[in-house]
Amino acid sequence: MVLFKKNKYALLFVALLAVSSSAWVVRFLPELSATTIAFWRMSLASLMAFAISYKTILTFVPNKKILLAGVFLGFHFALFFRSVQLTSIAEAALLGTVAPVFTEFYSIIFQKKRLSIKVLGGLFLALLGAYTLLSQSSFSDTSTFGNVLAVLCSAAMAVVLLVGKDVRKSVGLFEYSRWLFFYAAACLLLISLYQNVNVFSFSFQDFGWFVFLAAIPTTVSYTHLTLPTIDRV
């Protein structure tokens, strides 16, 4: 923990490593819909966050910004898990985690932010990596659609990061996360009703993977990605 507090890049590396693990887990759940996987990931993550921050349950009231972020997070996961089912893990994992590229472009266009050489270099490497990977893609209709969904899920995540950065200035980490995940789960439940998907149809083994997704790629990763130290990388 001392290393992470002193080295924000080590913290960022661990967070990104944790979030990338969700892509291959989906391959172990081929019979389940993307919405079902996403719903249980968010629901269990919300319960974990509530359990960790139970002392402030009655004293903190979530605001509309957290609701907005939660809705976009719900769409992010629905799109991401569907993209993993349609394209390769490598393409989904890369294209589904380029949200920082969108946030930086937002800063350039709307906030007139001047980027450092390090950030510009990072953006260049991210775009180069995406181009290199896609140049080797099969470009089938299914794969292409999956890649489009992965990019859209990153755009949705960019909204979550931008809103979260503002909210986290005055709200505690788990006070924010528990309601963020709760609203995302509620959004996914509504999506499942629209799709006529039964999110309660799964095996005991499937539930074990849900717990993993909630604990590692979500609680460990997404909560750390909203830390102030990460915002200043």
Residue map of PLM features:
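Glycine-/small-residue-enriched transmembrane alpha-helix faces in small-molecule transporters
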Residues: M1-F39, L68-V71, L79, S140-D166
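Loop-to-transmembrane-helix transition segments
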Residues: N7-L17, Y54-R82, F145-C153, F200-V220
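Transmembrane alpha-helical segments that form core, pore/gating elements
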Residues: L16, A45-A49, T103-F105, I109, ...
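Membrane-interface helix termini and inter-helical loops of multi-pass transporters
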Residues: V25-E31, L134-S143, Y194-W209
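Specific alpha-helical transmembrane segments that line the substrate/conduction pathway
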Residues: T36-A38, M42-L47, F81-R114, C153
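Hydrophobic transmembrane alpha-helices of multi-pass small-molecule transport proteins
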Residues: A49, L73, L115-S135, S154, ...
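Loop-to-transmembrane alpha-helix entry segments
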Residues: F60-I66, A93-G96, I109-T132, S143-N147, ...
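Conserved small/polar residues in nucleotide/adenosyl-binding loops
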Residues: T223-T229
